[in-house]
Amino acid sequence: MDKKFIRNFSIIAHIDHGKSTLSDRIIEFTNTLSKREMTNQILDSMDIERERGITIKLNAVQIKYHAKDKHEYLIHLIDTPGHVDFTYEVSRSLAACEGAILVVDAAQGIEAQTLSNVYLALENNLEIVPTINKIDLPSADPNRVKKEIEDVIGLDTADVPLISAKTGLNIQDVLEAIIKHVPPPLDAKDDAKLQALIFDSFYDSYKGVVCLVRVKQGTIKVGDKIRMMANNKDYIVSELGIRTPKIVNKTELVAGEVGWVAAAIKTVKDINVGDTITHTNNPADKPLPGYKKILPMVYCGLYPIDTSQYDDLKEAMAKISLSDAALTYEYETSQALGFGIRCGFLGLLHMDVIRERIAREFNIELILTAPSVIYKIELTNNQEISIDSPAKMPEPTSIKLIKEPFVKLAIITPDNYVGAIMELCQSRRGIYDDLEVIDGTRRKLIYKMPLAEIMYSFFDSLKSITKGYATMDYELIGYQAEKLVKIDIMLNGNKVDALSIIAHRDFAYGKSKIICERLKEVIPKHQFEIPIQASIGSKIIARETIKAVRKDVIAKCYGGDVSRKKKLLEQQKEGKKRLKAIGNVDVPQDAFVKVLSEN
């Protein structure tokens, strides 16, 4: 096929602006799937994606479209997630395209993640085609949104498609805009040395690891001996093809095409997403510039509530990590919770999705320890170490200073909530940076803020005080030294490692008090008094006491001498002393679940 009839594009938007619905309508309009085969969110392959109405894994399909100019075009559509946690999925799909459709909600207008995805597309030199969706809503105001797109992003909206992905209104306008504005891969040559960009991979129990690739140069065929340029490993192509979104086998993929390649690869760890595939016997001179590797931002320990399921949890993590390149994990143990796994996630939604997948797909209920970020610690001997867990914090005497990650936080909000948002940001140690006017009623607030503060229910608080109207986006900007301390929680004088947290010194007392009070509520009474203490080093900063349960030892004495009663009470007193010295505090698992989930 002539390269001028190929188009590769992706759909980008803020979460919930209608990307997946637009993908459905495009697939339906071009008769790529029959009516019987269509389901809502056809590209969202996981149940959890359909239920939450979000896209987590990117997906790529090939579509044939007969345009108004009487030519047939081969269009590759790559659907991407919109949530800030899954930006790495977006960056990968954009590297495989020449253009992007920017979907903007006709009622809500430009949101925080609309902007961050636009900047990603511009970094990849993509042609951006703005599209205004949901024009069938009573609150839709396409003219206001057009002006926003022109003023804030600087794109021309003279012939912007006005569509309703839900009803299928004007879907052909979007396809015509793609043909008109997205450039074809004219520099792609079928006879050049093979260069294919791996932009995703997933595990198939029959084929092994399947790579989703964009063939930039050359041709790849079944039986070819191929090499991964990052690790120099060689494989033989066993199968390849395209997705429509059904898997369709082919004998070859040519330059400009997007498809999948299977080559009996055992684990996803053997594949670097962003790597280049080339031929072993006639390799390309240099690899394609891959997408940037994004490191985990949030760390958390996962422990099975039923400790006998630890081996099942290890197997579950191995299987999930086969299809999730951003998930990192290592094994760890806790005195309180037993054996577990410490995982690195991209954010709290990513963490929640993994927890839910483990519960659903493998039937393992988990306790999650308090989420933590990576802290950099400068020691008194001038060495610098990084820690992702309070348990790894060195002794206070050996610490010179502690640095924590800061993010640039952008919040877009109706102007009547600006005051409440500023109060929220200041209470979370935010540093005011800028306030921009988006239109007559909306403002964009910029703050510098510690990442750790955003992780603890910041998004929920933001939605609550703005009645759900505000949107946010953040990016890591570096590390900054702060007055941070490790807070240990002790039960009956013994440290409970699973409950330790790192907090700012100014907020340490408040956080400690809350944890102690929660523990007092959930730990059952014992036959001896239990002190619950929070300490920084050797200094106790908060305390609650669980009173002993009273056992009536003199109930059996009817009348008689008072000295008999005194003797029994003295014996009980001695027994309680011994229990307090050697007795273990029995903390039920649901107490950990309750305290850690609310932490």
UniProtKB/Swiss-Prot annotation:
GO terms for biological process: positive regulation of translation. Keywords: Cell membrane, GTP-binding, Hydrolase, Membrane, Nucleotide-binding, Protein biosynthesis. It holds the Pfam family EFG_C. InterPro entries: EF-4, EFG_III/V, EFG_V-like, EFTu-like_2, G_TR_CS, LepA_C_sf, LepA_CTD, LepA_IV. It catalyses: GTP + H2O = GDP + phosphate + H(+). The keyword Kinase does not apply. Coiled coil: none annotated. It is an enzyme of class 3 (hydrolase). Its EC number is 3.6.5.n1. Its main location: membrane. GO terms for molecular function: GTP binding; GTPase activity; ribosome binding; translation elongation factor activity. SUPFAM superfamilies: EF-G C-terminal domain-like, P-loop containing nucleoside triphosphate hydrolases, Translation proteins. It is found in: Cell membrane. GTP binds at D16, H17, G18, K19, S20, T21, N133, K134, I135, D136. Residues 4-186 form the tr-type G domain. Belongs to the TRAFAC class translation factor GTPase superfamily. Classic translation factor GTPase family. LepA subfamily. NCBIfam families: lepA, small_GTP. This is Elongation factor 4. It comes from Ureaplasma parvum serovar 3 (strain ATCC 700970). The gene is lepA.
